Amino acid sequence: VGSENAKVGETWWFALPVPTNTSAEPIEITGVSLVQVPKGIEVLRYGAYSLEDTEGLALLAKEGDDWTPRFAALRDHSGEPLKVAPHASSDIYYLAQLKITSLPSRSARYCEFDYRQSGRAYTQTLDCEVELTGK
């Protein structure tokens, strides 16, 4: 996913993969991050929002656009572990708030999820990618 119209100074929201638990035991997600962030992109923060509140998955959205959810007015669930039931997908998903500080030369890639299951801590890295380029 990406945009060829990014400009220095803009802020974008990029959705990480929707948390899905394929195991038979519940999990609690305790943290998320983008692993490879190129020069030119600064991660301001990570938020966790309801699919219902954002009226679906806001895969990539420029802050301030008419169609972009008003994240500041929505409940951010990132302050607490996110519980995902066995064999289920979450109705809460994570987004990275990204600031363009200079035009990036490459994509931001790989999403890391920290979680607990049955008293043990795990980290899982999933493939995800956002490319923000401009002229």
Language-model regions, residue ranges each:
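Non-catalytic macromolecular-recognition regions in eukaryotic signaling proteins
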Residues: 1-135
